[in-house]
Amino acid sequence: MGAEARLSRQRAYRKGHRGEWLAAFALRLKGYRILAHRFKTPLGEIDLIARRGDLVAIVEVKARPTLGEAMEAVSFTAQRRIDAAADLWLSRQPDYARLSLRYDLVAVLPRRWPVHVENIYAAR
């Protein structure tokens, strides 16, 4: 891998990490408790898992220039991977039977507060 490609990947990683931190901060201010950051499974990765009461939000974080681009960035393939990872996470929870699950998006936009889109799959 060339030095330029490595630098580009490092920048993207840092940008993603900052975006996830900002998204988690915004969700905390809305009363959510962050249960996991970058939850990895063999089936996929979840950026954030947040909980408020009996509601668990599986949160995809996207840093894009516009909200529309952020929403479009969650492809059908990504949805399937996120669903599979969420099912695995949920199956490991002792109180899973009483939890409601929702898939959300937090769009990190330039020079703006993060936008929280609840129930991203239905919002399309």
UniProtKB/Swiss-Prot annotation:
Single GO term (MF): nucleic acid binding
SUPFAM superfamilies registered for this protein in UniProt: Restriction endonuclease-like
Chain segments annotated as transmembrane: none
Superkingdom of source: Bacteria
Family: Belongs to the UPF0102 family.
HAMAP family: UPF0102
Protein name: UPF0102 protein Meso_4010
